[in-house]
Amino acid sequence: MRKTSTYGLCLALASLAAPASAQTNVPGDPYVNDPVGIVADPCPPGRTIDNSGGWQMWNLHLLTRDFGQLCRYRADNARLAASGAAVRVVFIGDSITDSWIGADPAFFTGGLVDRGISGQTTPQMLVRFRQDVLALRPAAVHIMAGTNDIGGSTGAATIETVEGNIATMAELAKAHGIKVIIASIPPAAAFRWSPQTRPVPQIAALNRRLADYARRNGFTYVDYHPVLATPAGAMKPGLASDGVHPTPAGYAAMRPVALAAIAKTLGGR
């Protein structure tokens, strides 16, 4: 028994050690020369990180070099801080937030700042919350997250974990004097990238929990479903390009709802 246990322990240790080497040295990895470990500047100069090397290599890059994608907005944050411009609301989220500024650039004026990153889950947003939200010292933060957690983009998670990640972001904001707006997870009947997932009941369950959490903690809850969703929980026809990501018409429907939530949260600020 002891011999077997020792062998098993060695095997386990080997399996833990091996990926650390394998994940940073893979043939064909376009990011092989990117910095790793504790360095003065983790963001490679002179190029933009993207998924041109293929989805598998992009996932490898995220897992081993920039899980929270801190490099994405690092330069933008520095420019914003140097400008001295007041930040009213930071919008943090996934591709639905990331694409919002492209569909409605006029919305992100007057101190509204987009910090969405396509594909992100709540643990990834937590990693960058200090840099992309707290450090900008906004009056409020709009948190819209959970779609990719339900789709399994970074593995499995319980509904409690996803709610907890959003709650942690909200409570960090509150501790720094930042007002909190928690958004509903937008409607979706299916995910193209995760065809086995049936998201409607999970979205509904998480939104109930988020609405209750916001109410109990005095945060604003903004629900986009009345303007986006069908009675069955899908996106209304014409409001999403793929049943998930809003079209310009979808964002136009969201705009007054978001502005009302900001007015409720900040008043005249």
Describe these PLM feature segments.
Residues 1-90, 102, 107, 136, ...:
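N-terminal secretory targeting modules
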Residues 111-124:
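A short beta-strand-loop structural module common to alpha/beta enzyme folds
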Residues 105-111, 126-269:
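Alpha-helical cap/lid subdomain in secreted, periplasmic
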Residues 92, 115, 222-224:
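Hydrophobic residues at beta-strand termini and immediately following loops
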Residues 15-18, 95, 184:
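Short linear Ser/Thr-Pro motifs
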Residues 86-102, 118-121:
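Catalytic nucleophile-elbow at a beta strand-turn-alpha helix junction centered on a G-D-S/GDSL motif
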